[in-house]
């Protein structure tokens, strides 16, 4: 009984959603190297298949309805009114360069509404992308949808960007039987970066008398009852100006800090040298102050020491806490080959003491991830690039998908395989083949993966201005030709990448099979003068690992006579 109680208490203290754990980084125009706005999103779930969603622009009759299918389960939740025109959406970016990502934080369990609500968090994202030309309009659409039809999910953080602005929006339901949601949306100040990773991060904010949606000077929107609802529940009783959304509706716990805010901190400390002072907080040390709110939290947004590029964000999405006290490659759990991953569960118990593994940004169970880049100096179909990838961000390649494309590559298309159906033609399975083989001898194989990964992403970065300029010239003459051009480029680039990555997998299997390492010379495996394979390298285990084996084996491996 004691064991069961301790695990129950742990779950309550952690307050962490194990099924859907994601990471978002947000970059404003003034914080990016070229004036882009950018957001990232890693969709991490153990049952999520990585594929590139696409819906074309459509016109509908006045009486049209649309089914709402829950993203997580594919369950039909209900039907809602369709609008007269929807915009095309590739992945999580629409034709007007609006992009949306999310992370689930859960929050107070009594505020979930899984019976009377119709619209889940996934549907909110894609319905908003189909209906909004700007980030502000997307927030308005989201709020209107859950007010009219009810919110079906638990607490969510959204990243919402367009070619000029970046917003963070956090919401949570009102509990069973109540429509609407409690929410706040804040404009990230220009020149700053923000992040969220499964822990609500909005604390205090400037209360507004009304949501004046198209007033460009208004930088805060929120539910009118976001404070009064908490008062009525007895969860908050002091001044409105001190009200903290997160501390009331989703208080940070050990798990919220260690498994979630740790990822935010790791990004922040990589872009700002002053963020080291929040290491204790990120490790799970929560200090409480006024109103019992956490007083040692990180700021919601920070100014980076230097401006950030899309390629920088790709690197930050590959983080395993390297160089910190929580570096996942440096303890015994990494094994002899410094593997920066730990298989689930996140927590485990020995002699009635509960321990945890780290939860880094890069993780094995990523279905897909992206870096969305919106550029206001180009026509919309060309200005938006959805840098898309499947599987673990650490071992994948971000390939460019211009937001104006009219089809997606077959290797990434919906229906090409699924999580239970292997396909050599599917990007998800090809990248998983490489990553999962790499995990088996990580410190060696990751070097080969990095060479290819960096070569592809460097080439794509160098080609981008060339493709941009060619597409822009075509667009001035004939927009349809420009869209055909960027579609062909995006599709062919991605399909060719998958073919090349499949070859990388074959190379890695050949080179590292059976624990050996084949010798190479001038890009070819070595053979003897007679054409026979050269003897492989067998570097053995590192000394520190061998010492651990000796320490824990009670002398049973000691050689006490001739070894052969």
Kindly label every feature range from the protein language model:
Residues 125-131:
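Short, well-ordered beta-strand elements within core beta-sheets of diverse protein domains
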Residues 16-21:
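Sec/Tat signal peptide C-region and signal peptidase I cleavage site
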Residues 452-564:
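Histidine-centered catalytic/metal-binding microenvironments
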Residues 334-473:
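Substrate-recognition/cap regions that form aromatic- and gly/pro-loop-enriched pockets
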Residues 8-15:
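Bacterial N-terminal signal peptides
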Residues 267-355, 359-361, 461-465, 470:
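Accessory, solvent-exposed terminal regions and/or long lumenal/extracellular loops of proteins
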Residues 22-121, 141-308:
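A contiguous strand-loop segment
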Residues 1-6:
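Bacterial N-terminal signal peptides that target proteins for export
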């Amino acid at each position: 009984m004691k064991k069961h109680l301790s695990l129950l208490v742990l779950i309550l203290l952690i307050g962490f959603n194990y099924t859907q754990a994601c990471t978002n980084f947000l970059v404003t125009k003034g914080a990016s190297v070229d004036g882009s706005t950018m957001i990232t999103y890693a969709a991490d779930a153990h049952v999520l298949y990585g594929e590139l969603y696409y819906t074309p622009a459509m016109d509908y009759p006045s009486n049209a309805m649309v089914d709402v299918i829950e993203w997580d389960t594919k369950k039909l939740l209900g039907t809602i009114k369709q609008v007269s025109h929807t915009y095309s959406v590739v992945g999580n970016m629409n034709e007007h360069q609006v992009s949306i990502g999310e992370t689930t934080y859960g929050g107070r369990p009594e505020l979930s509404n899984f019976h009377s609500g119709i619209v889940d968090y996934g549907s909110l994202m894609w319905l908003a992308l189909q209906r909004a030309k700007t980030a502000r309009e997307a927030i308005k659409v989201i709020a209107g949808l859950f007010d009219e039809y009810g919110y079906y999910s638990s607490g969510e953080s959204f990243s919402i960007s367009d070619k000029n602005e970046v917003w963070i929006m956090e919401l949570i339901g009102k509990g069973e039987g109540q429509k609407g949601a409690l929410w706040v949306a804040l404009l990230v100040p220009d020149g700053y970066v923000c992040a969220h990773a499964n822990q609500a991060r909005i604390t205090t904010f400037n209360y507004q008398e009304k949501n004046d949606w198209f007033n460009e000077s208004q930088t805060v929107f929120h539910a009118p009852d976001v404070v009064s609802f908490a008062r009525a529940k007895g969860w908050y009783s002091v001044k409105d100006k001190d009200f903290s959304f997160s501390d009331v509706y989703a208080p940070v716990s050990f798990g919220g800090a260690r498994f979630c805010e740790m990822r935010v901190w790791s990004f922040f400390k990589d872009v700002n040298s002053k963020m080291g002072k929040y290491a204790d907080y990120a490790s799970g040390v929560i200090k409480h102050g006024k109103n019992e709110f956490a007083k040692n939290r990180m700021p919601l947004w920070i100014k980076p020491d230097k401006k950030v590029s899309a390629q920088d964000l790709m690197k930050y999405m590959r983080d395993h806490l390297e160089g910190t006290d929580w570096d996942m490659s440096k303890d015994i759990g990494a094994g002899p080959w410094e593997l920066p991953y730990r298989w689930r569960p996140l927590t485990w118990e020995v002699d009635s003491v509960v321990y945890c593994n780290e939860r880094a940004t890069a993780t094995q169970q990523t279905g897909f991830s992206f870096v969305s880049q919106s550029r206001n100096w180009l026509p919309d179909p060309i200005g938006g690039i959805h840098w898309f990838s499947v599987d673990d961000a650490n071992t994948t390649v971000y390939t460019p998908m211009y937001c104006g494309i009219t089809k997606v590559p077959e290797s990434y298309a919906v229906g090409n395989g699924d999580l239970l159906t292997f396909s050599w033609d599917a990007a998800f399975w090809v990248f998983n083949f490489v990553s999962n083989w790499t995990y088996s001898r990580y410190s060696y194989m990751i070097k080969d993966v990095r060479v290819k990964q960096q070569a592809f992403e460097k080439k794509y970065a160098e080609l981008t201005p060339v493709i941009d300029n060619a597409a822009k010239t075509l667009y001035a003459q004939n927009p349809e030709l420009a869209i055909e051009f960027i579609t062909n480029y995006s599709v062919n680039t991605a399909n060719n990448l998958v073919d090349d990555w499949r070859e990388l997998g074959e190379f890695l299997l050949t080179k590292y099979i059976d624990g050996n390492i084949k010798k190479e010379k001038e890009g070819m495996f070595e053979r003897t003068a007679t054409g026979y394979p050269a003897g492989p390298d067998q570097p053995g285990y590192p000394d520190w690992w061998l010492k651990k084996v000796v320490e824990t084996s009670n002398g049973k491996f000691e050689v006490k006579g001739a070894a052969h």
